[in-house]
């Protein structure tokens, strides 16, 4: 059985996860933990895709590591927004950017793990007061996605120029991760809304008053960041990549999660009794009625009840209520991180201290780090899993009577030997091993990135 993390390694990996400060990002110890988080994230996704026992989720929850994951997500957010700009001021065109990319990827892996764990109420229960920090984080991430969509980001098919400046490429990578993380956060907020009664009243207030999540989700559903129109037709964001769809009305996961989040909040009398349905909110929520067409309700029947509620709300008009005085908890994680930054000279000082790490020009160090990270990302294993999935789909198609010409022998693009693995990006070029793939990458990337 293929695994990214073997059962005997699981306990060690989970126990090794610890909170880092912003100044520690990119350090050897940070990279070591990054490799473990990456492996756990890949293993968790594998367990879900194959309907296996969710061991990663169980270990993270039982060892109370979800707060650490939230802490680390905030840590990377502060680094990429407050430290990275200073690093690029020092050197606008760094010689190697893969370590910066690694930090950006780290945040996506953390959010993916939170998404897996919080699907279960037991995961939500372990959050305790850190749920406030997570709500703030998710609301900010979703708002950033709305900002990108409003600027037409998702309508632009990425055609990367090979001669593109490094700074522009980094900005593109940052936006790609903002997009993926933001859509994941829709799912996370839905799980929190579904289990909001497990938390202190401060969590409900954070959702409804501080961030007005029903309003935010109405914006998300109006902008539809999971759908775009391209020269190839309508595409939807499925499994973290854009895919052509024949049926435009078919609901994808982020869309369903956004609808359910609105439903869980608006139809929960325990938390909505103090939500002021003023004129502005009624007008905003009324937009949802125009989106609730028959194909949507056929696929998501629980939304029928929400449609009835919104229709009555439109007829009843303004029902604003006085907000009661409520003492609430204050999010702590970001404040703790900022306090450590101040005690260590501020963000610019951290950037100067990390100059030798992220802006290194030592070719030996760069090559050694590249080798280490390439192993962490498990190119061979990823290709093997993708090939297994492709073979499975091909077999299902044959069983269904689709026919075919049988297995096709592919040759390695580097050494011309028989090859079963293929590039994980374009899925068009085959290789017999990771070594051959790495040798061919300088030439293949010109075609692969354009594809």
Curated annotation (Swiss-Prot):
- Location within or outside the cell: Cytoplasm; Cell projection, Cilium; Dynein axonemal particle
Q: In which tissues is it expressed?
A: Specifically expressed in cells with flagella and motile cilia: chordotonal sensory neurons and sperm.
GO molecular function terms listed in the Swiss-Prot or TrEMBL record: zinc ion binding
Q: Which superkingdom heads the taxonomic lineage of this protein's source?
A: Eukaryota
Q: Which InterPro entries match?
A: UCP037948_Znf-MYND, ZMYND10, Znf_MYND
Q: Which family does it belong to?
A: Belongs to the ZMYND10 family.
The organism of origin for this protein: Drosophila melanogaster (Fruit fly)
Asked whether the keyword Zinc-finger is assigned, the reply is yes
Induction / repression: Expression is dependent on the transcription factors that regulate motile cilia such as Rfx and Fd3F.
Q: What is this protein called?
A: Zinc finger MYND domain-containing protein 10 homolog
Q: Which GO terms describe its cellular component?
A: centriolar satellite; cilium; cytoplasm; dynein axonemal particle; neuronal cell body
- The UniProt entry's coiled-coil ranges are none
Is Zinc found in the keyword set? yes
One of the GO BP terms on file: proprioception
Location (main, coarse) = cytoplasm
Keywords on this record? Cell projection, Cilium, Cytoplasm, Metal-binding, Zinc, Zinc-finger
Reported function: Plays a role in axonemal structure organization and motility. May be involved in axonemal pre-assembly of inner and outer dynein arms (IDA and ODA, respectively) for proper axoneme building for cilia motility.
Q: Which amino acid positions bind Zn(2+) 2, per UniProt?
A: 423, 426, 444, 448
Q: Note the zinc finger regions (MYND-type) by start and end residue.
A: 412-448
